[in-house]
Amino acid sequence: TNINWRKLLVFLSLFISGSLLCGLYLPLPAPKMPVVSEVYDSRHQLLTTFFIENRSPINLNEVPPFLRKAFLAVEDHRFYQHHGINPGRIIKAAWRDLTQRRLIEGASTITQQLARNAYLNQKRTIIRKIQELYYTIKLELHRTKDQIFELYLNQIYFGHGAYGLKVAAETYFNKKLSGLNQAEMALLAGLSKGPAFYSPYINPQAARKRTSEVLQRMVRCGYIT
């Protein structure tokens, strides 16, 4: 009987491992990111808009280089070097979780954030973290870094009903992305950490401090001098 149980456990382990490995090579569906629907009259004049999430997707090449670097500096400056998972961050996060005896540290790369926000939920459980790592690997296998970065920038919630960079620029500055100055770009990058707390409408002092932190981080990363 012991031998039979041993064989069964080996079989189940191999089956589960094989299923997971096969699953890695199946691409994920495109993330569901609701966009704005526009209604025009016969003269092509905009009448009204409808949306669940106020979002207008953009291509990565529409994002100014300075703005891209601002996000990389504060969110994941090694994004283009790693494969979606930063072992150093994970070890640091695991240590903090162990010392606090609860899941408090995110340690998320840009790819992990996209996996969590586009496909999973915000629950801080071991199971969800394992799912997040699995989806992260799948994203890295089936999409280029630029595609992942583009999805990430279109997916972020910036507060005040604004989803994605384009709508965020319009909401906070009434500008197109190409018309933003460097301080405005740094502010948008800083909002991703906590749009409710760092909103210039709600907490202008915290927004200014966060903008300064983003610029300082860009200096440390060598993006600006």
Residue ranges with predicted function:
Residues 1-225:
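Juxtamembrane regions of bacterial inner-membrane/periplasmic proteins
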